[in-house]
């Protein structure tokens, strides 16, 4: 007997799994019965967000499926006990830059948090009502303690005036509501405040349009006088260009930071003369793109050593660095993802994920690396788990691209003779993001049903150095799509997948790649777009401040290159778009507005292409509520069954596919929008 479901919020069910020498059920790929349902994938699995050391405890944020994905705060004591401090119903979550981060700060017995619903910044203290400290129309995040005058320093985004919101560093009084005092302003974006141990120096990061924080940023340093005023403000090494991030003072007051001066994000420090000294020379990345505030890729154990996470081509590890000798000791290299590295009272803590279901909060101490808290996760018996195969392939022009291949695995089934599995080509968003090989129930949902999955790290992904990351600049909607097409061809040539059952799916920027692949190429036979981009020109006019000039890098300056924007927009090139498409869209999306999906849906529907649109009320950019995630995943399965002619197992929602009768019939030309 095998326990096929573990930690899914319900008792595991015993199911007889055949031994290797027993007869397995022969069935079509895609129709296999899986022990992992969509409700198990999204209905009970929680996710850890940020860590922070407060006194002898570690505070961490965690989402709650039972509360519709809302986020609360828990406390991890040294003895391993867990206490809920802020209930998920409160719903913490900053929306600075829309993506948020840096949602809470602990000081003594009090917590200071941003509430997701109203974006006010609250003080939560024992036996007291929550007190809002900030005015309406402002958003705060990434706060740090500043003992002078009982204040804290926060990143603020001010939305109270027309036009773009204003960025600043402000001080907030901990005891009463008020406007707060501006410490630093005058820049398009500000992040990452850090203060030294004796509260005499403050460091921070800024960047200006059209840069993103992974392009070119500036590191600043200022002195704090006895009155708490910021003086002697200077930029560190203004002559050197790079993406600098995560400044942090060592216990003895030396300023460290991460920069990609040598193509890779490595550690640097400011020496006694004020010169920059490179501390690590890894051909790997310490840290990642700052989509959110409050990221921590390293922490100091003491004055002599630090612990840092690193990423190499999608795999993650942990190292200890001797600050005097420069000697590096690799503590772990078997992780798929590591984030939120913080110094606690009894060791360094971090959030880690592995290729196996084991994930959670880990501690590094004299006893080694140990898992100290694991949230609920839907684990599977190994007989149902697909393991990633690291793939490097040659793409158009002879360049190399990367990805992870997951073959179909189900201990109860075998495929029909002489068949190959359908492929789901999965594209991450960003496009400055990356796929890794962390155990993901959403991937196992597909592989345990008989699908092959390929997670593509197309040119532009992180984890491969600055040059690879910027190879997409000027080529977005082209190079990423070419990589997907060439990856599919590689997998077909290897005999791993069925050439007639190739599907491509992605969200946001990945959704653009999906639509472009179907509009400009004929490799894929179906596509699924989650809040994808169909009109790049309109996106640049409608999106929020943080990404409003991102397209200057990805495409080129507008309106000078207006023609290229239209050339790359799938909405205007539907003549060759003939394959079925499913569109899923949050109707409150502020990053990629619903019109991006609605317009291409109407054009394809009018053309006669089999097309479905699911607009979801109450959801923004990325679905948060478990029941909506479940609906999307199950609808996607139904869609593939209709397109690839198999019957999925289980009770699934009905899907209205317009022009379903035309699945095998030539389509007519679409009407272009006026």
Predicted regions and their residues:
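Cap/lid segment of the alpha/beta-hydrolase catalytic domain
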Residues: 160, 210, 375-500, 507, ...
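C-terminal motif of bacterial Sec signal peptides marking the signal peptidase cleavage site
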Residues: 6-7
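Active-site-proximal cap/loop segments of hydrolase catalytic domains
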Residues: 458-674
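Conserved beta-propeller blade repeats
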Residues: 43-57, 91-109, 137-152, 185-203, ...
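Non-catalytic accessory segments flanking enzyme active sites
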Residues: 47-50, 61-62, 71-73, 83-84, ...
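Short loop/turn segments that connect beta-strands within beta-propeller blades
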Residues: 77-80, 125-128, 173-177, 224-227, ...
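A flexible loop/linker signature enriched in serine peptidases of the S9 family
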Residues: 62-72, 92-98, 113-121, 135-140, ...
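A short beta-strand motif characteristic of beta-propeller blades
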Residues: 36-42, 83-94, 129-134, 179-184, ...
């Amino acid at each position: 007997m095998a326990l096929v479901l573990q930690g899914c919020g319900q008792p595991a069910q015993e199911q007889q799994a055949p031994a290797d020498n027993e007869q397995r059920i022969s069935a079509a790929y895609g129709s296999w019965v899986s022990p992992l349902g969509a409700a198990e994938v999204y209905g009970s699995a929680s996710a850890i967000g940020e860590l922070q050391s407060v006194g002898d405890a570690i505070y961490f944020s965690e989402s709650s499926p039972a509360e519709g994905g809302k986020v609360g705060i828990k406390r991890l004591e040294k003895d391993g006990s867990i206490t809920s401090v802020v209930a998920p119903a409160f719903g913490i979550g900053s929306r600075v830059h829309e993506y948020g981060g840096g949602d809470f700060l602990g000081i003594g017995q009090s917590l200071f948090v941003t509430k997701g619903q109203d974006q006010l910044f609250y003080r939560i203290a024992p036996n007291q009502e929550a007190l809002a400290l900030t005015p309406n129309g402002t958003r705060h995040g990434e706060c740090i303690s500043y003992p002078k005058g009982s204040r804290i320093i926060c990143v603020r985004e001010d939305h109270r005036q027309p036009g773009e919101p204003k960025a600043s560093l402000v001080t907030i009084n901990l005891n009463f509501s008020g406007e707060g005092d501006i410490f630093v302003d005058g820049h398009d974006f500000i992040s990452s405040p850090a203060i030294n141990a004796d509260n005499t120096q403050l460091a921070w990061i800024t960047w200006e349009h059209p840069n993103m924080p992974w392009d070119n940023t500036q590191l600043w340093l200022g002195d704090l006088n006895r009155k708490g005023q910021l003086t002697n403000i200077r930029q560190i090494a203004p002559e050197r260009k790079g993406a600098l991030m995560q400044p942090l003072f060592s216990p003895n007051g030396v300023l460290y930071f991460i920069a990609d001066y040598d193509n890779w994000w490595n550690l640097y420090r400011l020496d006694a003369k004020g010169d920059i000294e490179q501390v690590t020379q890894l051909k790997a990345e310490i840290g990642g793109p700052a989509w959110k505030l409050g990221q921590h890729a390293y922490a100091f154990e003491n004055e002599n050593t630090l612990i840092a996470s690193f990423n190499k081509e999608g795999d993650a590890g942990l190292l200890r660095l001797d600050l005097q000798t420069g000697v590096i000791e690799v503590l772990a290299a078997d992780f798929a993802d590591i984030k939120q590295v913080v110094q606690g009272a009894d060791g360094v803590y971090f959030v880690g994920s592995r290729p196996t279901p084991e994930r959670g909060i880990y501690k590094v101490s004299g006893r080694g690396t140990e898992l100290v808290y694991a949230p609920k996760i839907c684990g599977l018996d190994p007989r149902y788990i697909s393991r990633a195969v690291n793939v490097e392939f040659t793409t158009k022009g002879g360049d190399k691209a990367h990805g992870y291949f997951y073959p179909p695995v189900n201990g109860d089934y075998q495929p029909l003779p002489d068949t190959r599995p359908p492929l789901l080509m999965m594209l991450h968003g960003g496009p400055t993001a990356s796929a890794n090989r962390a155990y993901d129930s959403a991937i196992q949902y597909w592989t345990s049903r008989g699908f092959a999955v390929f997670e593509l790290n197309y040119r532009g992904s992180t984890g491969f150095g600055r040059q690879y990351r910027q190879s997409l600049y000027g080529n977005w909607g082209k190079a990423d799509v070419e990589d997907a097409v060439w990856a599919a061809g590689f997998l077909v040539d290897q005999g791993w997948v069925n050439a007639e059952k190739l599907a491509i799916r992605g969200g946001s920027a990945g959704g653009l790649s999906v639509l472009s692949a179907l509009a400009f190429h004929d490799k894929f036979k179906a596509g699924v777009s989650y809040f994808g981009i169909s009109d790049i020109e309109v996106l640049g006019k409608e999106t929020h401040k943080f990404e409003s000039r991102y397209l200057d890098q990805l495409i080129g300056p507008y309106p000078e290159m207006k023609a290229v924007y239209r050339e790359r927009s799938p909405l205007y090139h539907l003549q060759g778009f003939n394959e079925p498409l499913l569109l899923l869209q949050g109707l409150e999306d502020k990053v990629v507005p619903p019109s991006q999906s609605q317009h291409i849906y109407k054009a394809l529907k009018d053309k006669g292409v089999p097309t479905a649109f699911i607009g979801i009320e109450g959801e923004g950019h990325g679905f948060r509520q478990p029941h909506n995630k479940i609906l999307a995943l199950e609808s996607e399965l139904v869609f593939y069954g209709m397109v690839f002619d198999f019957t999925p197992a289980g009770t699934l929602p009905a899907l209205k596919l317009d022009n379903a009768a035309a699945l095998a019939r030539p389509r007519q030309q679409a009407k272009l929008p006026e």
